[in-house]
Regions:
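AAA+ P-loop NTPase domains with strong preference for DNA replication initiators
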Residues: 1-81
Length: 81
């Protein structure tokens, strides 16, 4: 499933090694959020997290910020790893 796929990418740091994953990792993260929103009853809370992480992705790309910290936070807060 998508959750395990994202955990695998983050733990093995494939986003650094594979150009396809590097170019698409943020799309996979957005798909995961959309899946959570559609499946959960607490949509408002997840929607707020979604907006927060989308802003972080925007700033990460715009200012070339540290991806490692972003992925650790995403894994901890969203993937519960």
């Amino acid at each position: 499933d998508l959750k395990n796929f994202l955990i695998n990418i983050i733990e093995n740091k494939y986003y650094r090694k594979d150009t396809f994953i590097k170019n698409n990792i943020y799309k996979f993260i957005e798909f995961y959020f959309l899946k959570l929103i559609s499946l959960n009853k607490s949509q408002k809370q997840i929607h707020l997290l979604y907006e927060n992480f989308i802003k972080k992705i925007f700033y990460l790309k715009k200012f070339n910020l540290d991806e490692e910290a972003f992925f650790i936070e995403f894994k901890t807060k969203i993937l519960n790893g």
